[in-house]
Amino acid sequence: MIQFKDFQFYYRKHQQMFEGLNLTLQKGHIYGLLGKNGAGKSTMLKNAVGTLYPKSGSCEVNGVLSSKRKPSMLSEIFFLPEQISAPEVNIDHFIKMNAPFYPKFSRELFDKVMSEFDLKTENKLHQLSHGQQKKVFLAFGIATQTDWLLMDEPTNGLDIPSKSAFRKVVTSFIADDRGIIISTHQIADIEKLIDSIVVIDEGKLLLNKSLQEISEKLSFKLVN
């Protein structure tokens, strides 16, 4: 699981972003992390992977403090950021450099997802469009078969057919022993994917419910 405990974070001393956030996310779900721009969605994801650190409180992944960035934790979480910095290598070389960090990486699965996206591994990463780079990194993330797959605005830069392929490959990833968090403000792109919703605003947790729970609360019975 991913747990935020009494989580506090700010970029500047007098600009508090999170103050005492408590949130638990379980494997086996696809979470939609929703909120307006600047609400703190990206900050949460970056704290989960340990590239940012809480000012107090903690964030744990599978019981390990993410701020420690232990190899055992990093090998079980993959983060697809909104902005990608692609190295000047071809895709095959990228795989050789990065796959060893993920013990469960499957080249067969990577090639399968790349085929879904109609991309070839001979391509140079830095010469691809932003949308194509996202597809490569998503294919790599799926192929890592980590416990957690975190994505920040993953459908930005994708055309309609690519968004359809995105939904297909993400659906293939989910299992009881894996979890997915998708941060977005384009809910239409993921509404058929997610089974749970987390809404934050100005660093506060407004909602953390499954779609089933929400549906049950909104349902009504016809009265004869």
Where do the language-model regions lie?
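A short, flexible loop at the N-terminus of ABC-type nucleotide-binding domains that lies
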Residues: 1-21, 27
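Catalytic Walker B motif of ABC-type/P-loop ATPase nucleotide-binding domains
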Residues: 149-153
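Conserved ABC transporter NBD signature motif
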Residues: 57-68, 72-73
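Helix-to-loop junction immediately C-terminal to a conserved catalytic motif
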Residues: 49
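The feature captures the beta-strand-to-loop junction immediately N-terminal to the Walker
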Residues: 31-36
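ABC-family P-loop ATPase nucleotide-binding domains
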Residues: 79-136
